[in-house]
Design a protein with these regions (language model features):
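Short, small-residue-biased leader/transition segments that mark boundaries at the very start
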Residues: 1-8
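Histidine-centered divalent-metal-coordination microenvironment in nucleic-acid enzymes
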Residues: 3, 85-101, 188-194, 240
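Helical (often loop-to-helix) elements that flank the catalytic cores of nucleotide-handling enzymes
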Residues: 5, 66-74, 98-125, 146-153, ...
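Aromatic/basic-lined ligand-recognition segments
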Residues: 29-47, 106-197
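Long, highly charged low-complexity segments enriched in Glu/Asp and Lys/Arg with interspersed Ser/Thr
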Residues: 250-296
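Non-Sec secretion/translocation targeting segments of pathogen effectors
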Residues: 306, 314-316, 321-339
Length: 339
């Protein structure tokens, strides 16, 4: 495709500790393939493979408008025989620039993850095989950052490392293995989201990025985000409402919502499923009454399609079960944000 052609085919083997290969795109940005020893190696046939299969792709710093290019790169990897996913202990790690965050915005950010991490664990189908490489948020850190309400980043840093400040200079600090990694922020100015399973489905990858950016936007724009852990007996409805509150509204984000909701159980249109059952029963009674009246008056009955259109919830922002099958992403983008 024209987007994929934006990445040159010529590779450069730089070698080094991670046996690095790089490919430049037309903007002279490096896309890298590097060794990653944490991956379980299988080939495309599912057979055990050598460590030459133990690699990951690192993109350059991208902006929102680069997502179509990233999607084409993902498709090219899949077409070339690349494999990834929970079985391989592989994940998608997304780094978000946060060098202009205030202490309150960092507090908002970690509170969002602390409050919604149970939802995210289910929605993202977090693999148990990867639990060695990230956990839920540190409850002691969340309690202290909300009790002390730090006003500067150094104080937040002290809370993050629990006073063990030498860890900030260690690349593999144990503090990095959480759903929202601030160790990366203190070292490089960007935090890391580690919750996503690896995927070579371009639509899933886009939905992962869009959710990460929406959470970032909420952390920056909301005055205060509570750490109170969200609970629900209708996860699909509650998670959908949260996505809409994050701004993932309308056709632009419909496909993202579909991917993010497709693993959740529950009634998407009704907070209490029994209300949906009652509403459908009432609609059925209404249909039958109208049919009886139509037969008595010898007129055509109201069509079932018309009845459904008049009585069901607006679908404009609600993915249905059928939309979750054989789905491919749309590629129309709107806003522009840095990643």
């Amino acid at each position: 495709s024209s987007a994929a052609s934006d990445v040159y085919k010529r590779q450069v083997h730089e070698g080094g500790t991670y046996d690095k290969y790089t490919v430049k795109d037309i903007k002279s940005r490096d896309w890298s393939i590097v060794y990653d020893g944490s991956i379980n190696c299988y080939n495309a046939n599912g057979d055990r493979a050598s460590k030459s299969y133990s690699v990951e792709m690192n993109s350059p710093v991208l902006e929102y408008g680069d997502i179509p290019l990233l999607q084409e790169v993902v498709r090219a990897l899949r077409k070339a025989g690349g494999v990834t996913g929970p079985r391989y202990c592989a994940g998608t790690h997304i780094h978000i620039s946060a060098d202009d965050y205030t202490p309150q915005q960092i507090r908002n950010l970690v509170n969002i993850f602390a409050s919604k991490e149970d939802f995210l664990w289910d929605a993202l189908q977090v693999s148990s095989a990867r639990e060695s490489y990230y956990h839920k948020m540190d409850k002691q850190f969340i309690e202290e950052i909300n009790r002390k309400k730090p006003k500067d980043m150094e104080e937040i840093k002290g809370l993050w490392y629990h006073g063990r400040m030498s860890e900030q200079f260690q690349h593999y600090s144990n503090s990095r293995y959480v759903i929202c990694n601030l160790h990366s922020f203190f070292q490089h100015g960007h935090y890391e989201i580690r919750a996503y399973n690896g995927s070579l489905h371009a639509g899933e990858v886009r939905s992962q990025i869009v959710l990460a950016l929406a959470i970032s936007n909420a952390a920056m724009t909301k005055k205060y985000c509570s750490p109170h852990v969200s609970q629900s007996d209708n996860m699909r409805y509650s998670f959908r409402v949260w996505l809409l509150n994050l701004g993932l509204i309308g056709d632009e984000f419909k496909n993202c919502r579909t991917h993010l909701l497709k693993h959740l159980d529950g009634d998407i249109a009704w907070r209490h499923p029994e209300d949906g059952i009652a509403a459908r029963a009432k609609l059925k009674e209404k249909r039958e009454a109208e049919r009886q009246a139509a037969r008595g008056q010898r007129v055509e009955p109201v069509s079932e399609v018309q009845e459904l259109n008049e009585n069901v919830s607006d679908e404009n922002s609600e993915p249905t079960e059928s939309e979750c099958e054989n789905f491919e992403e749309d590629e129309e983008m709107g806003m522009e944000m840095s990643m």
